[in-house]
Amino acid sequence: MFKKYFCFSFLIFSASLLITWSAIGQSKMLSKGDAAPVFSAQASLAGSAFDFSLRTALAKGPVVIYFYPSAYTGGCDLEAHTFAELKDKFTAAGATIIGVSADDIQRLNSFSSDPNYCAGKFPVASDPEGKIATTYGLTFTPPKIGIKDVRGQEVTHGFIPRTTFVIDKKGEIVAVFSSEADHISPAEHVEKALAIVKAL
């Protein structure tokens, strides 16, 4: 009798876990008007690792958080390069830029200092398990075998969809756009974000 009860209870528990996990995986992407989840993460600026705090950044002004799939891949390289080119204009608007991907900090140390990409102009943060992305309602895709970056190196981390959140200094999301939903290019992410922070 006890054995049957135990097995039945275990099945119910397992089913509840599956339901909970499914709900987490299908969480809705945050939108305009939502409070931006604060986070801290290991990040890199100009090849040097440091601890980035969204709370600290917001104390200085608006923040542009741009999630991207991977360093050293076509669209992400273009996006980083465009942010670097327009960094002074974001600074003039009082805004902080932070990129977030699942790349490990070693890759980001290289990417953040590469003159062709981030060029030491703004930091990029590591979210290796997609925990930050998940709090923003983004889907974290597990690693895929056989994918290589523009340098020919295998990409072993998971992926976060290209999505940009513009957050005002009160911590409220004032704009969000994604390549998947809005069908915009990596460069357009940057241009739209700049136009919004200028208007704040």
Segments and roles (model prediction):
Residues F2, W21-I24:
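General N-terminal leader/first-domain-start detector
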Residues A23-L200:
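Chalcogenol-based redox active-site neighborhoods
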Residues S9-T20:
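Bacterial N-terminal signal peptides
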Residues M1-L11:
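Bacterial N-terminal signal peptides that target proteins for export
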